[in-house]
Curated annotation (Swiss-Prot), chain B:
Annotated SMART domains: Ribosomal_L14
Domain of life: Eukaryota
HAMAP family found in the cross-reference section: Ribosomal_uL14
Name listed for the protein in its UniProt record: Large ribosomal subunit protein uL14c
Keywords: Chloroplast, Plastid, Ribonucleoprotein, Ribosomal protein, RNA-binding, rRNA-binding
Amino acid sequence: MPVPLCMKSIVASPESLGARPLSLLNDMRRPDFRHSVTGRLGPIRSITTINGPEATVTDGSATSPDITMPPRIKFKRPDKTAKHIMQILDKEAVEEVRKEREIPDIRPGYIIQMKVVVPENKRRVSVLKAIVIARRNAGLNSTFRVRRLVAGVGVEAVYPLYSPNIMEIKVLDKKKVRRAKLYYLRDKINPLKK
Amino acid sequence: MIQAQTYLNVADNSGARELMCIRIVGASNPRYAHIGDVIVAVIKEAVPNMPLERSEVIRAVIVRTCKELKRDNGIIIRYDDNAAVVIDPEGNPKGTRVFGSIAGELRHLNFTKIVSLAPEVF
């Protein structure tokens, strides 16, 4: 049985992995497309070895037990890995939150005023004026750390950037700092904002 | 994470200035105390001419810790010092004023009087 032409395009070297969907599209325009699709769905997933095309095609009818196959090295298509999928989900979640609320760019050294809903207090804590001392980027779980003086005692708080408890963030001032994390402010009595 | 021998500031006007923790109250012999836990403490420094004197053993509830307090909504709070409020065996504060911000967790632990006296509840 002659190997159909579409098979040759599928049996590809790893470089054309990314182009594989295109080759399948090309096949769809061929007259024998139906035959090709029903005939072979197996090798499409398994053509990932680096050894060479002749080793990968396993014709269901024609392998004899004498032929020794070199070990298969499987690797996943990059867009099928869980890491990639999680990245997409993360970006979608972030965009969804950004559509609802306007979240300004917050960097260390900014003095911000935020309105936070505190469920313990059953009211809004309106004026939370603080200086941002750190920011951690982790997609939807990005957090930022603020520091403020409350009745003579310094209080630091870490907030998730996309938390629904934060009603509003307003940037009041931007101080020039030469660090990403301003933990040295803990030793200083007079924070930059004054 | 307050343990025995920890010095704490006093966040009210009961007359004590500094306490040293000697014991954490609790049936399970806890090693550390956090915000909202009651401790037994001895007064190391006191304001003169007040009902509380130095080297008196009293109970106090911790209101501020340098160790972070984590909340379920992802907010983490960290104070710059360790502080406590002197209380009597029922849980009422001995002083009449409370200084500094108080964490909202104390309200759920039935320290409502302290929370109502606080200038800011956070």
